[in-house]
Amino acid sequence: MIAVAPVVFALLAASPAPKTPKPDAREIHTSALVIDTHADTPQRFLDERFDIGTVTPVADGHMDLQKIRAGNLGAEFFSIWVDPNHHTRYAHRALQLIDAVYEQTRRHAAEMTMAFSAADILAARQGPSKKLAVLMGVEGGHAIEDDLGILRDFYRLGVRYMTLTWSNTNEWADSSGDIKDTKIAHHNGLTDFGKDVVREMNRLGMMVDISHVSDKTFFDALNVTRAPVIASHSSARALTNSPRNMTDEMLKAVAKNNGVVQVNFFSAFIDEGYRKAFNEQTPARNAALNALKAKLKDADPATQYRERDRLQKEWSARIPRPPLKSLIDHIDHIAKVAGEDHVGIGSDFDGVSSLPEGLDSVADLPKITDELAARGYSREQLHKILGGNLLRVFKECERVSEQLRASAPDHASH
């Protein structure tokens, strides 16, 4: 025994150290609070009379309750988006969309519940039912029709973020979507009224969303805000050179502000090859869409929406979908440039015509966790990215609001 002991010890010393087990990505995903900050499903509720309890093919939509359960989605910010190309009564259309969200939640109360605070999100996920926390964000400041009273009304109805612009420059903020269009009157960022909008959003506790805005508007908003900002559905410009994406300088500015960038899943925002091909077909695609609009000018809204969506998807399908790796690269890049506390997910489900391979609907969200875990992201990091970072920002905006409301008069009667 004494003679063989040194040999045994030598063999043990020569043996490789046991490998650290890889995190169980699916268990991590299941245990996470998954928050997505952008889905355009309300358009389907209103224009298609779509019921979220109806299981639909992925070709027809990215979201239904079955897919939501499969993807372990815990909270969704449904987009209240008013297309300025098809509607002129912006606030009226926004109210219709808000009503449609409430109606779906009422209809499926066993599985969905309206949420108005960070605490409400957490409460919705308690117990065996684990309901989907339903929140709303207005996409495009034109919806308030230059009226802070309408902004306050949206807050009272449950809107908890507003994107300062959509792809159109409004009366008080420049958009990235038309910043190079010389026919559009621009403001060089935010006007004085636009700065008042940001201040009032801070006071209300409504998160300031800087997706879609021009670079100058972005920096103006960060100079004015007293609360963290969000980019509800934007990706990294260093990887995909779209003005809708954020430069590394902007990513670092969001980190300094303690905000969060929620990565968009649209193929043209996450893959440079796809973006170039998509832009090359834009003139022909727009001509086809305009011809369809003229053809359907007397059709009902549901038909117009359905046919427009079908045609856009047909054109996008002519371009090969990028790999899922492209999306993961954007999350990884933002985590490295801004920090792991400043990145999340903002899918743009039901609002885009192409998603990366393997990501066909909300049911496929666990694949994102799989890929990030394979790159070495820990359980704690994944929980932050999947929802923890957004929840932190939401709570901080609520805290700032409490301070401002305590020191400023209530404008409710104005």
Mark where each language-model region is:
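N-terminal hydrophobic targeting/anchoring segments and the immediately downstream early-domain regions
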Residues: 14-185, 237, 241-414
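Active-site-adjacent beta->alpha loops and helix N-cap segments on the catalytic face
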Residues: 170-179, 189-190, 214-224
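Bacterial N-terminal signal peptides
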Residues: 2-13
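Substrate-binding cleft of carbohydrate-active enzyme catalytic domains
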Residues: 196-210, 216-220, 250-256, 333
